[in-house]
Structures are given as C-alpha cells and as structure tokens.
Amino acid sequence: MSTMREMYPKNGRVILHVDMNCFFASVEIAHDPSLQGKPLAVAGNEKERKGIIITCSYEAREYGIRTTMPLWEAKRLCPQLVVRRPNFTLYREASFQMFQVLSRFTEKIQPVSIDEGYLDITDCYALGSPLEIAKMIQQALLTELQLPCSIGIAPNLFLAKTASDMKKPLGITVLRKRDIPEMIWPLSVEAMHGIGEKTAEKLNEIHIHTIEQLAKGDEHIIRAKIGKHGIDLQKRAKGTDDREVDPSQMGQHKSVGNSMTFSKDMDEEKELLDMLERLSKSVSKRLQKRTLVSYNIQIMIKYHDRRTVTRSKQLKNAIWEERDIFQAASRLWKQHWDGDSVRLLGVTATEIEWKTESVKQLDLFSFEEDAKKEPLLAVIDQINDKYGTPILQRGSQLLRKQEKSFQQKLENKFM
C-alpha cells in the first residue's frame, strides 16, 4: 500500500472527470442491443420529418450528422438512420445507476449534469493507482450498464474536464500542469471550457486569441474587460483551479431550465412569446414538483446566424409560479430581442433554494395575496394534471386561447 501511496501527490489532489459518451444514444443502445453498430439518432417525430437531432451515435456522426440538425437533413445524409424519440425517464434512471456505480469508488462525487461528474480520489490509493481506478470505473460502467465513458485525470476540476474531452469514445487521459504549455496553450480561447461565444469575442477585442495569450495576458486589462470571471479564467489557463469537489451537490439544484430548438427560423413575436410562456410553465412545474424557488430568471436567445444572447433578471423576492416567471422572462425578451429570426429559445430559473428555506420580504398586501392564491393555484394545477388538459385557467390565460392550443401548433410546426 505504501508503494501505491507514492503514486499520489503528497500535497495536491487527484480529480477524475467522468463524461458519458453520446449518453442518450448509448442508453437507447443499452436498452435495445439490436441498435449496436447502427447509425442512431435521438430526435423528434420521424414520421413528420420535422424533428431536431438531440444527440446521435458515433456511427451517425461519420455521415456528418450532428446535434441540432433537422431530422430531414440527417435522413438525407444517412437514409438508413435509425431514429428514437427521447425517453427521459429511461435517461434519468440510467443516470441514477451511473452515479451509483461511481459512489462505490468514493463518496466525494459532484454531479454537474445528467451524464457527467467529478470524483476526488486523492485518498483512494488503497484501490490502486489513479489510472487503475479510472480503468475500473470505465469497465464497470461498460460491463454493468453497457454505457461507454471518457475519463480525465488531473490535479484539479478544470484540467480533469479538459482531459476528458481529449479522447472520445472510451478514452482515459492524464493531464498534468507540466503538460499545459504543449497541450492546452496552443488552442484557441473558444476551445477552453468555461468560455462561451460572447466571452471569446470580448477576449478577441483585447487581442487574446489563444489560451497561452490568456494565461500571459495583463490581469488589469482582462479584469476591466470581463470582470472577476476573466481572472478566474486566466488562473485556469495557467493550470490553477481551487474549486473542490462538492459532495453536497448530490441531489441539489443549481438551476432549472428548459429550451426549444426550432426546426426553422422563427420571427413572429406572438409565436415566440407563446413559446416563452410555454417554457416558463415547464420551469414552474419543475420548481414546484421539487419544492424549489428562484431568485433569478434568465432567458437565452439563439439567432439564425448562431449569435447567442443570454440575459438575466435579479429578483427581490423568490418566485416559482408560471405567471411570475413568464413576467420576468417576457420583460427580458422585450428589452433584448433585436427583431431578428430566432432558432432557439430558453428560460432558466437560477439562484435556486428550497422553498422552506427561502425568506420572502413581504408587506401586508403581498402576504395576503400570496396566502389566498397559493391553495387555489395548487388545486388548478392538480385538476389540469389529472385530466391532461387545461380544464381550469386564469382570466389572463383565456385571453390568449382564442386560436387553437399552443400544444397543437407546436406539434404541427416542430414535431
């Protein structure tokens, strides 16, 4: 054991990032082994040929098929493409089983999405070397769940995440700080985890195009352009990341959101606002189901030319109802939509906490209003859920129901 202990750093940490390969498609293959080796896509209604590719297998990617591609285009590239409708119940169960497997190796696990998570194995030397543990995890997921994954091994979260992206599928990559100048610095800033399109544009404006330039850039200029987040990114570009694996996030929620990618560009404001309301309702239901509230509402607008705008509104009081979420989202929409056609729309509730722990700053009138309407809203939701259609609606909702239902329009247009 003492020899194995020498395989671990004396002062630093050993972090694994486990990232499942083509997760939804892999779960479908595990559920139906006859799909093995076939070009497979998880997408919308294949009969209507109007669905969007959510994910696809590596066999499908060899034909040029990619995420968000319209299904008709994917079928044109690969006529023999096998299509499955998304089964999120199946995916959630597979995710649960995946984290159950990971928990056999260490209790220090932090999920970051349905199909990826970090493990701190610094104290796991009794199980073997870091590379041996990674191989055991990969093999366990593959043999027990028939789910492939890639794993990054590094001294911190950022480098572990970066390493797991380097070899797919079924890759295991070790990334040390001494590897950064050769393996990371030559890459463009757009390739760096944590840098989106807008941040990359801001960095480009101050003549930072590569990760090396970010690492060696003037801290004051970077802070002035991007703020504290820019300094955090610069530290990571140098290989420094002080974040720790947080096991308390097992079961916690950072955000609750929904988005819709359209099969064609949309520019009619009424239809886009209808979609925004639909997404707000979905977010509200998920918050209420988990007894959560939000102090910040965010919208994302992705235009036809791939420009992406993300804006948020900080709230004085916690909210969870559809009406309040839609009100905040629609205000953001009216302030930031430039009138151009839209390809994707999203609504996300952030700054989440348990409803029982939230402290709402109420005056007498708002307290009475909330106290009166909360039981009624619960009954309305229960009745509507029971019958599957909006039997009961508020007056404001009825004014928007003069045309056929949004669900019908959605299915006719996009599914």
UniProtKB/Swiss-Prot annotation:
Recorded GO MF terms: damaged DNA binding; DNA-directed DNA polymerase activity; magnesium ion binding
Where does the record place Basic and acidic residues bias? 235-246
Q: Enzyme group, top EC level?
A: transferase
Checking Pfam families in the record gives: IMS, IMS_C, IMS_HHH
Top-level taxon of origin: Bacteria
Where Mg(2+) is bound, by residue?
D19, D115
The annotated active site, in chain numbering, is E116
Domain (UmuC): residue spans on this chain: 15-196
Q: State how the cofactor is bound.
A: Binds 2 magnesium ions per subunit.
**GO cellular component annotations of the record:** cytoplasm
Polar residues: which segments have biased composition?
249-260
The keyword DNA-binding is annotated on this UniProt entry: yes
**SUPFAM superfamilies recorded:** DNA/RNA polymerases (SSF56672), Lesion bypass DNA polymerase (Y-family), little finger domain (SSF100879)
**Where along the sequence does the record put site: Substrate discrimination?**
F24
Cofactor(s) essential for the protein: Mg(2+)
Family, per the entry?
Belongs to the DNA polymerase type-Y family.
Its recorded name reads DNA polymerase IV
Origin organism of this chain? Bacillus cereus (strain ATCC 14579 / DSM 31 / CCUG 7414 / JCM 2152 / NBRC 15305 / NCIMB 9373 / NCTC 2599 / NRRL B-3711)
